[in-house]
């Protein structure tokens, strides 16, 4: 089963992110993960939401350009070298990562690495054949957030 993220090209100026989150909030779409990157006057917002197709529809209805991108979410060990193991396998198989980011989860004491690649099916086959677990959209939406304790 495929997972998706919303990728939104944006101008680098105040209130853009708030405009996007407001639209999604009004439609009761929950944001599970967000990354924001800018380069000069523009950038991208990547969102994993609980209903990506409805999120895309809501944003487009408000005139916001948005792409629904297939992603692979991989469960990795949260330890030094955990991400490197995955990336070395993908490198050996010549899989180019166009976009990627990760986050730690408490429920499994692991991390999730999100990959955006051109050939997701082949990349997912390589990942699974190497013993890594990929998360279904349902598993992704049910992740409990990691809570830092003991500041």
Where are these regions (language model features)?
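A conserved regulatory-domain signal marking ACT and ACT-like small-molecule sensing domains
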Residues: 1-151
